[in-house]
Amino acid sequence: MNTLALALASSVLALSIPLSPAFATIETHEAKSAALEAADEARADMAEVFGDKQLKPGQYVWRDGVEGAPRVIISLSDQMAYLYRGDELAAVATISSGTETNPTPTGIFPILAKKTMHRSRKYDNAPMPFMQRLDSYGIAMHAGFNPGRPASHGCIRLPAKFAAKLYGVTEVGSTVFIAA
């Protein structure tokens, strides 16, 4: 009986301990659907919060004074990044995502690591300022060339000033939704 009680207590304890962010990447159909819904909501929130403003490649808008836990939503179809603080849309920026041959993965990702200046180990030591890694294969959000269309090897390139500000508000473990 004591062995059974100990086993049950251990199981309950194990379930109550959050998993490491390294194990929290979700690329299931449900996660991809949730990311699409989040992107649809973000698009509508952008119109409500920032009006009909059309951003050109490399541009962003940012509302200071918005507080709360950060959450990032990436829309690959719109080539846009949306930052929420709590339930409020705080910022929007244009992005450049992966190409058809080097696609950006979709789903729900935690920020696994952050580095103010990183260099790619895969692509000719390419600079990746304000790098925020999203998976174990090297996909990250970082400052980079932003032509307004998919042009990366899978990373999410952000306008440099937006990338620096975003880096300042996110934490390892912050959630990033990436929608097709």
Feature-to-residue mapping (PLM):
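N-terminal pre-domains immediately preceding structured catalytic cores
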Residues: 1-130, 137-180
